[in-house]
């Protein structure tokens, strides 16, 4: 079984992120095309992102969905931007940036 995993790096709000994209997950065609995308913050290592508190996210989707965004990088950037508008993320981000004296 030949696997085709593409790797991309982006910078999002000062966080370096690695995107690993496998358009045909495990090379399987089982009547539904399954793609796999992994998102990991690498600098700072495992930094929180709006789509994951651990800095890592594994996501299965359709390759057509990702293609509709213009590819894996555009898909992840759109996902991050959308989720970064959520009130919980904005509050948490503000708290992380706030200096603490204790």
Please name every model-derived segment:
Residues 3-35:
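Amphipathic, interaction-prone secondary-structure segments
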Residues 38-102:
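Acidic, low-complexity intrinsically disordered segments
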